[in-house]
Amino acid sequence: MKKILLLGSGELGKEFVISAQRKGQHVIACDSYAGAPAMQVADEFEVFDMLDGEALERVVEKHHPDIIVPEIEAIRTERLYDFEKEGIQVVPSARAVNFTMNRKAIRDLAAKELGLKTANYFYAKTLDELKEAAAKIGFPCVVKPLMSSSGKGQSLVKSADELEHAWEYGCSGSRGDIRELIIEEFIKFDSEITLLTVTQKNGPTLFCPPIGHVQKGGDYRESFQPAHIDPAHLKEAEEMAEKVTRALTGAGLWGVEFFLSHENGVYFSELSPRPHDTGMVTLAGTQNLNEFELHLRAVLGLPIPGIKQERIGASAVILSPIASQERPQYRGMEEVTKEEDTYLRIFGKPFTRVNRRMGVVLCYAPLNSDLDALRDKAKRIAEKVEVY
């Protein structure tokens, strides 16, 4: 049995904890608020600000974990190097977590060091720098914080008149203490995919069937698997994913995102060194091993006999229309559970924000079924659930 310190306790962390406990592991779930989803199923929990390096060190000293598994971006990541030197396994590695928590580090690694094709981009520390960069890139363009999650602070800017708002919105959505934005050209893509990539301690890099997804405001709204893409584009995406994960080092599951264009090919977008929100579709049994089981096996060094597509799947998120500190209630579960070949996951978040992701509907069907119809089904069912 290993003692695992989970940094971040959202819905992805909750599913990881469930997988870990099924393999007899001991998990301490951490987050900045009590009652977070993963805490509800963990052996122990800690509530503290993970951007506070001293608080993080105190928790590590208290629990003496064998493994540290980051689940969110807002962590004092430079401390992870020290923990790794002390013999604690950081997943997938301290280098990987440190690079990917900051869009500047990962974009420069991908574009400048590894030569991956990306959108043209600049950085801006002031509004004036943002205006200068926009003049070079042109409109429309995309403005994002260097550190954020779930699309927070991200905007599509269509004219110079919108830059001041984009600057303020970007800074307000930034996680951590970094006040710098990335501005990038808007790629006219036909689709975007997540390629779940598994790096192992002993074994080859593995890839899950590609996951298509739809975002709104930079935040995941639906995903489906397998995404139907050009085999040549898939091969190119796999080569890019293997290149960047190898450079970052370590064992675990990664969510590597790409833009696909019939005209211009494959563009690397970004990656997360952990299970991905769009990968929740694998909870519909689309694969022989879902993304959380794959992550756990890679972390523990357990064999992965291969990844097989078992059936098609689609997910659609359930959002909160309200903001409240009261524990949320849900209507419509009876209607949802009448549906065949459908799972409902309510994450158990103790309070709401407007558009906060509170649950997900997962639908599945046999291979070679109509994927578009399945996507429509998942969205229709998700709309039946009301958060109040």
UniProtKB/Swiss-Prot annotation:
Reactions catalysed: N(1)-(5-phospho-beta-D-ribosyl)glycinamide + formate + ATP = N(2)-formyl-N(1)-(5-phospho-beta-D-ribosyl)glycinamide + ADP + phosphate + H(+)
Domain ATP-grasp: 108-300
Transmembrane portions of the chain: none
GO terms, biological process: 'de novo' IMP biosynthetic process
Enzyme class, broadest EC rank: ligase
GO molecular function annotation: ATP binding; magnesium ion binding; phosphoribosylglycinamide formyltransferase 2 activity; phosphoribosylglycinamide formyltransferase activity
Database matches in NCBIfam families: PRK09288.1, purT
Full protein name: Formate-dependent phosphoribosylglycinamide formyltransferase
UniProt source species: Bacteroides thetaiotaomicron (strain ATCC 29148 / DSM 2079 / JCM 5827 / CCUG 10774 / NCTC 10582 / VPI-5482 / E50)
Gene from which this protein is expressed: purT
